[in-house]
Amino acid sequence: MARYIGPKCKLSRREGTDLFLKSGARALDSKCKAENVPGQHGQRRGRLSDYGLQLREKQKVRRIYGVLERQFRGYYQEASRRKGSTGENLLQLLECRLDNVVYRMGFGSTRSESRQLVSHKAITVNGQTVNIPSYQVKAGDVVAVREKSKNQLRIAQALELCGQRGRVEWVEVDLDKKAGTFKSAPARSDLSADINENLIVELYSK
């Protein structure tokens, strides 16, 4: 399945906000002006139609979590079948992805790096190696770095960065063991207010 491997800054500029696709605790640097669209001359973005706003919000969330369109639509369909708010269900499904949980626990400095750790069999769930980034982690699951991968420098650096930006409340991590417990799926109030999931629901409901 194809995946974008181009400049991360370009994606953030396209969405007009920092998507935190690059490692490090700081936001976009001065060379990546989020208010300008990608291109040699970086023209400022114009006003968008309602459809344009909905599309941009969907693209933004897709890129934050590193999910391709077909898979993202599948998450929406699953979210719509569940009880409660479709938008909140969608965000919870994305947050429960194994690659995202690895990122939230601080074992990877970005979701992309976390996805690579999972794909390279460096991560276990409840003691079993899982190499599927989209695997849905459940409340109470223990996610850990495999013993032979614990000495990787990038994991130590990622844990340090996570300590600087702060770890989310719905995971509990033992830094010495490089293992963590996924306590529960996050509530909507725990997630970024910069995401307007209702726009995505409106887009797919048409």
Swiss-Prot record:
Keyword Iron-sulfur recorded: no
Highest taxon above the source species: Bacteria
Under InterPro entries, the record lists:
Ribosomal_uS4, Ribosomal_uS4_bac-type, Ribosomal_uS4_CS, Ribosomal_uS4_N, S4_RNA-bd, S4_RNA-bd_sf
Keyword terms = Ribonucleoprotein, Ribosomal protein, RNA-binding, rRNA-binding
Which Gene3D superfamilies does the UniProt entry name for this protein? Ribosomal Protein S4 Delta 41, Chain A, domain 1, RNA-binding S4 domain
Q: How does it assemble?
A: Part of the 30S ribosomal subunit. Contacts protein S5. The interaction surface between S4 and S5 is involved in control of translational fidelity.
According to its UniProt entry, what is the function of this protein? One of the primary rRNA binding proteins, it binds directly to 16S rRNA where it nucleates assembly of the body of the 30S subunit. With S5 and S12 plays an important role in translational accuracy.
Task: Return the similarity comment.
Answer: Belongs to the universal ribosomal protein uS4 family.
Output the NCBIfam families linked to this UniProt entry.
PRK05327.1, rpsD_bact
Q: What is this protein called?
A: Small ribosomal subunit protein uS4
